[in-house]
């Protein structure tokens, strides 16, 4: 029975180039899609750029472009990656397309009519200089849990804490450096806490193998409430205030859908765009409209995603679809991240970053990487580690040494001695070997279906070992010199080519370009899994051309070579002229405690600080940090000050020292002012040496 599948990968955010994590996911999904096509199924494989949100709006403004043009320019570079790594999307679209506007608003109305949308007034940070509400990631400040500086408004990269932006200490706008103010605004919430949603999601996440067991275990945590009734599913804020680049919420002027509401709907929008362009009709003779197709219970819907976006795809997305009257996914396939050298996080500056375009520009074969990634992938949520030495070994030993060599060891004899024609009488041993290879077809199709690509490739290479054992046992190079052994030589070489064809069928989902070369060499129609049970017989093949080069280890050195670092001025300015230690020792730096902080009337920049420097009295110091700190947030903090600076008479009084703070030389380009704080344990009066 022919299956009909709708397959997607996570939508990349349209503010930058693809990274290796994107390519890994596309390769994983593409292998599965190509396998399904080779099994004779109808697959609609679509992608799109995630085009909305404040980050894109702000990046476009900095680039002097409209958001639409900014996104279009990013999208124009996608094809180089997708073609380069043989990713076979049927359609690539954008969440800013008219289809997504229509679908997002339609789905929202259905949720609203179902009583699952609620309007609430909330307080959120507003940048008075930019005149806009700030997204969580554009608010920075001190972590409310551990006190780490310069953390984002929703989570701490130091201690891992998650919090709301209003909990951040000493917040500032990452856009302007201004201190944000709290303003009230009506926001629209999807009531995920509604008992109907909770009941449905409890059922959906546990039925029919929709999720991997590791994912189910994680989802259970999100359902769980503590002894005080806290936790469990929370309502989802799906709105953002103008100015915002996104889709307007119906009947709510100045309100836009949060990007995570319309982004997954972009899966449907890309499919609709594909249908509207006539793609399925041209490819499969599909006569139905998008609406008819997507409503068909027999249509299977699959999403490949990274583990970092599991929450959205296993809770919000199925609930959004179900309660808007739409079909939910059959499966959400979650994968891990890509690391390098036994789990090290990738970093371009350290020379541990794998740049996909650099890989291609070095002339490295895309199918080396496809094979290597596939060999590491399984159906679990595990990270994939790229080890350069392992990469060279697997490609050279497996692909070239075991698989390609089979054809090269036989094709020359067939061409020279038999005009390229295969024998139809393959002998008992040869037939037994080929039957062994054919018998693995169902095992391999089961492994591909289950996304156990690593196991599948180990099976194939095990079969390649058997073929090479057959070659070594029969020694065609000796048969070619032996008088009267032509018939045996013909049979042995024909068995090798037939075995090579079977192995190529089994590898074709992973190595489509190489398979196309093999099809040309064998002079056969495109290979499918159904052909594994058929033999070529007395068939004439073409002349053998070299199919794949070995990996030169020097290419890996070049791939991971750190980019040349441009000479830059640290902090935006040259290091000051060199001084002697005696000069530095003249400056007396001391720890001080801020006893009191208050604004200075008539000054936009100054705060009046009352400091305890451990002298038995307090000092009065004026500091130009008003734009970065609220007075009430400074009281009780420990700072570093210049204690032996001569008192200076100012318009507002006498300043008895200087508080140390850091900033970039160009504060407009890189805003932010950061008072220096000592580690816990320092006390007033301690000298900084």
Swiss-Prot record:
Cofactor, how bound (note): Binds 1 zinc ion per subunit.
Cofactor: Zn(2+)
Domain tRNA-binding: 583-689
Enzyme Commission code(s) on record: 6.1.1.10
Record's catalysed reaction(s): tRNA(Met) + L-methionine + ATP = L-methionyl-tRNA(Met) + AMP + diphosphate
Binding site for Zn(2+): 143, 146, 156, 159
Renumbered ranges of motif 'HIGH' region: 12-22
Positions bound to ATP: 348
Any one of the GO CC terms: cytosol
Keywords carried by this UniProt record: Aminoacyl-tRNA synthetase, ATP-binding, Cytoplasm, Ligase, Metal-binding, Nucleotide-binding, Protein biosynthesis, RNA-binding, tRNA-binding, Zinc
Compartments in which it is found: Cytoplasm
GO MF: ATP binding; metal ion binding; methionine-tRNA ligase activity; tRNA binding
Primary site of residence: cytoplasm
Recorded superkingdom: Bacteria
Parts forming coiled coils: none
Family (UniProt): Belongs to the class-I aminoacyl-tRNA synthetase family. MetG type 1 subfamily.
NCBIfam families linked: metG, metG_C_term, PRK00133.1
Cited function: Is required not only for elongation of protein synthesis but also for the initiation of all mRNA translation through initiator tRNA(fMet) aminoacylation.
Subunit relationships: Homodimer.
Protein name: Methionine--tRNA ligase
Organism of this sequence: Leptothrix cholodnii (strain ATCC 51168 / LMG 8142 / SP-6)
């Amino acid at each position: 029975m022919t299956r009909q599948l709708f397959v997607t990968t996570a939508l990349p955010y349209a503010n930058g180039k693809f990274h290796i994590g994107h390519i890994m996911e596309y390769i994983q999904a593409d292998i599965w899609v190509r396998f399904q096509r080779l099994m004779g199924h109808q697959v609609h494989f679509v992608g799109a750029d995630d085009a909305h949100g404040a980050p894109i709006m702000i990046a476009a403004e900095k680039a002097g472009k409209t958001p639409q043009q900014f996104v279009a320019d990013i999208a124009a570079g996608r094809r180089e990656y997708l073609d380069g790594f043989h990713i076979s999307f049927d359609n690539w679209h954008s969440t800013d397309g008219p289809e997504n506007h229509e679908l997002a608003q339609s789905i929202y109305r259905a949720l609203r009519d179902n009583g699952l949308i609620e309007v609430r007034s909330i307080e959120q940070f507003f940048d008075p200089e930019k005149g806009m509400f700030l997204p969580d990631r554009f608010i920075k400040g001190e972590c409310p849990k551990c006190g780490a500086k310069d953390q984002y408004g929703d989570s701490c990269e130091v201690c891992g804490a998650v919090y709301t932006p209003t909990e951040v200490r000493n917040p500032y706008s990452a856009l302007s450096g201004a201190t944000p103010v709290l303003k009230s605004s009506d926001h629209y919430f999807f009531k995920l806490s509604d008992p109907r949603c909770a009941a449905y999601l409890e059922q959906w996440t546990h039925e029919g193998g929709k999720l991997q067991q590791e994912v189910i275990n994680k989802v259970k945590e999100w359902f769980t409430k503590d002894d005080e009734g806290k936790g469990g599913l929370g309502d989802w804020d799906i709105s953002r205030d103008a100015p915002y680049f996104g889709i307007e919420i119906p009947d709510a002027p100045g309100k836009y859908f949060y990007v995570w509401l319309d982004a997954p709907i972009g899966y449907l929008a890309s499919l609709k765009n594909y249908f509207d362009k006539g793609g399925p009709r041209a490819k499969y003779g599909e006569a139905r409209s998008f609406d008819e197709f997507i409503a068909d219970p027999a249509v299977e819907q699959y999403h490949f995603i990274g583990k970092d976006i599991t929450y959205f795809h296993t809770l919000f997305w199925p609930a959004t679809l179900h309660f808007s009257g739409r079909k939910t996914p059959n499966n959400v396939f979650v994968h891990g991240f890509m690391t390098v050298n036994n789990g090290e996080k990738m970093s371009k500056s350290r020379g541990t970053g794998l740049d996909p375009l650099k890989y291609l520009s070095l002339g490295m074969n895309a199918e080396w990487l496809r094979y290597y990634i596939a060999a590491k992938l399984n159906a679990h949520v595990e990270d994939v580690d790229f080890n350069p030495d392992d990469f060279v070994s697997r490609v050279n030993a497996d692909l070239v040494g075991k698989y390609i060599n089979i054809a090269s060891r036989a094709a020359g004899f067939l061409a020279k001695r038999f005009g390229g024609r295969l024998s139809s009488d393959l002998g008992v041993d040869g037939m037994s070997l080929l039957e062994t290879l054919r018998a693995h077809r169902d095992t391999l199709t089961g492994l591909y279906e289950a996304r156990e690509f690593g196991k599948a490739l180990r099976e194939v290479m095990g079969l390649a070992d058997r073929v090479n054992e057959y070659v070594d046992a029969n020694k065609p190079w000796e048969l070619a010199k032996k008088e009267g052994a032509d018939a045996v030589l013909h049979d042995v070489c024909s068995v090798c080519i037939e075995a090579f064809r079977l192995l190529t069928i089994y590898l074709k989902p992973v190595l489509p370009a190489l398979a196309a070369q093999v099809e040309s060499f064998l002079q056969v129609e495109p290979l499918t899994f159904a052909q594994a049970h058929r033999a070529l017989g007395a068939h004439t093949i073409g002349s053998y051309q070299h199919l794949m080069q070995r990996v030169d280890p020097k290419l890996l050195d070049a791939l991971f070579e750190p980019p040349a670092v441009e000479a830059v001025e640290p902090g935006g300015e040259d290091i000051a002229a060199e001084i002697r230690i005696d000069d530095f020792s003249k400056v007396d730096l001391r720890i001080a405690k801020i006893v009191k902080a208050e604004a200075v009337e008539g000054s936009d920049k100054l705060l009046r600080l009352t400091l305890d420097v451990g002298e038995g009295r307090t000092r009065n110091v004026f500091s130009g940090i008003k734009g970065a700190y609220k007075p009430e947030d400074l009281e009780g903090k420990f700072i570093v000050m210049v204690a032996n600076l001569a008192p200076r008479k100012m318009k507002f009084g006498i300043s008895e020292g200087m508080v140390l703070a850091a900033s970039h030389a160009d504060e407009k380009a890189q805003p932010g002012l950061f008072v220096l704080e000592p580690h816990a344990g320092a006390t007033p009066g301690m000298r900084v040496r």
